[in-house]
Amino acid sequence: MNAYFDDDHAVAVMGTELNVHGHAWAVEEGVAELRAATYPQYGLMPASFGIVVAPRAQFEQTIARFEVAAGLPSPRPGGEWGKASSLAERSYLFITALREDDVEDVIRWAHRGGFGTVLIGGDWSRSHGHHEINTAHFPDGLASFQRACRRLHDAGLRVGLHFLAAAVYLGDPYVTPVPDRRLVIDARGALGEAIDGEADFVPLAEPPAEFAAEDGGYMGRGTYVRIGDEIVQYSALSLEPPYGLLGCVRGALGTVASAHPAGQAVEHLHRSYGYFLYDLDSDLADEVIGNVCRVADAVEADMLYFDGSELLQGDHWYYNAKLQSLYHQGLANKDTFLQGSSYSHASWHLISRMASADGHGDVKGYLDERLPWLVGYEHNLMPADVGWYYVYEPTVTADQFDYILQKCLGYDASISVHTNPTQHAIHPEMGEIFDLVAEYERLR
């Protein structure tokens, strides 16, 4: 946020353009500078910022006034400044695998738990990228999804859409059968000699030192390269002569294996959390974001959750803000409640609440590890959400939720119960858990 405040006074230095990096810098013990900077790669100009000074008790209201005066986004979901809104205080029910036929059941459980919003899991989308409606869950496509959301609204519930904000799934038409040229590339090479469509060794002119050495799983960069209109998956690198990619699967991800001439570009496709990224500096960003915003507008979504917005293509402070700003610009309702998995200096103005993380396994120990994050959110004047706590297995108990909810009360943080309609019917402690959530929500 780039601010300092104590019990009496407050000051912030806030950039007013996406290319302005606001950050605090420790000069010496007990002394810090609030800085605003621009950099050539993102544009030295415009280089505008504002200085906000106020009594501590009036700081938030003064920032809200500054946003309007400076032309910054200043969402007011429900008619209130986002971070001060009642919507930022209310807990929400996160439902995955929602089908149109499940809506009445979800309404009953949402009311029982005292939730004000139902966040619909990202499987409403058949494939991230094109974001067509998942007809396995909503048989009539968008019309079915609209009916489901309308029923939630009619029941007095707000509707949220969860999705992976920067994602293009590996099976999406932007990837297969012909990979789009506007996917993020993080390393490049060139063929050292021509290859046919069957070669399992891809020779390179130089050592592929910048390519991922291994797949890396969920957190890895992956081992996919694009050569022309073909995607190739390799299993190892050869960093000594002959340089190249070993153990290659040709025509990966449904692309067509083909011959390529010497000198052809070999481009490493950057993978993040198991999916590819669209280039935020290309018009593919407008296409993918437009696909989501059209659905959000059509169902009159009250909330969007930008998941996966921390592992992007470059400097987080810039690309996180660019990503979330493009979504905000694409929405008809500029007062949509926005939440995400991360924020930066510029996107701080957009985000109305921050979640801690996904609670699973030893949820008590996990939450204890995450509690310092909630303090950090408070220091950035960001309302806290302890995050998503799963109810998918019988090992998740009401006792565990009682512990989590005590922390919600102490830290004045919302919670999201993360489950699906099948678990509503079979989990032995589902009713007790939802009753506890409702009780603590009233207390808080």
Write out the residue ranges for each language-model feature.
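Active-site-proximal substrate-binding groove within the catalytic cores of carbohydrate-active enzymes
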Residues: 319-444
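Carbohydrate-recognition beta-sandwich/jelly-roll modules
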Residues: 1-118, 151, 155-159, 302-303, ...
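Flexible loop/turn segments at secondary-structure boundaries
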Residues: 125-131, 166-171, 232-234, 311-315, ...
